[in-house]
Amino acid sequence: MCGRTACTLAPDDVSKACSYQDKQGRQKCPKWRDGDTDKYQPSYNKSPQSNNPVLLSLKHFQKDADSSERVLAAMRWGLIPSWFNELDPSKMQYKTNNCRSDTITEKALYKAPLFKGRRCVVLADGFYEWKRQDGEKQPYYIYFPQIKSEKFPEEQDMMDWNGQRLLTMAGLFDCWEPPSGGEPLYSYTVITVDSSKTMNCIHDRMPAILDGDEAIRKWLDFGEVSTQDALKLIHPIENITYHPVSTVVNNSRNNSTECIAAVILTQKKGPALSASSKKMLEWLQNKSPKKEESRSIIQSPKLSQFGAPPKKTSAGLMQQWLKKEDGEPSPKRAKK
């Protein structure tokens, strides 16, 4: 399952984080589709029906473009099929935020866009999953293992992204045109697979994550890579890490740094943390721990318990984790 994500990077940083090499070996950052940066709002707590950054082939919008060229678009989470004939897309009766890989070639909802080559990569800092234990549900934040950088986001060149590695999930999209006319609605679904060994202790399903640019290239390039070959990329992966977070994330209206901040479970034992997660907990613990009765919320001293929602120019808590010096406050930049 994948029903809640965090995506806190500003639009320009999303583009930098998605840089790739084209067929000529040139490093490129995909551009946003015109007008879509205004549709995307960074958030620590994004739920279905929100607009989120999606990577896809430019050829879907420009027929003369090479299918290997990429573009960023803001799409609605929850696929609305092109054949939907209601005036209001919110009247869609089926939940389409996820699509099971084992039925993707059978259900008409997903079969049509799949065989039309409407493959996309859904971008996020990470996603949330809830573990059921003793009648309760404990949320976990799941993401790619991060490599800390010596550079600050403000110091990076356009083609030299050293910030957080975005989670890249395989998805399908479709385009619905209102029967009464108006702007077409682009929407997507996240493909899910059986959980890997790493994830199985939390949930039995996980998003189909594309690990590495070669997998992303093959999934997006519908002109060169057949549907059959593309589906071979859809499988569980082990290269993920996670940590428990506060139940404040349970309410989708909550949008603060507390949603992704690591907590230490003190009463009930959760799944064993990975090495990367343990390092992150140690880093956060060196900051300013705040104890509660049943768990401890660990946050940076610069972040209040209910920190402000991410701005389109903010780096967020995960970016602080990527700084080189553990336990040291981020140095202030000199005013020009």
From Swiss-Prot:
This is Abasic site processing protein HMCES. Gene3D superfamilies: SOS response associated peptidase-like. Changing residue 129 to A: Abolished ability to mediate self-reversal of covalent cross-link with DNA. Formation and reversal of DNA-protein cross-link depends on DNA context. Catalyzes formation of the thiazolidine linkage in presence of abasic sites in single-stranded DNA. Mediates the reversal of the thiazolidine cross-link in presence of double stranded DNA. The record marks 203 as: Required to stabilize abasic sites. SUPFAM superfamilies: BB1717-like. One of its GO terms (biological process) is interstrand cross-link repair.
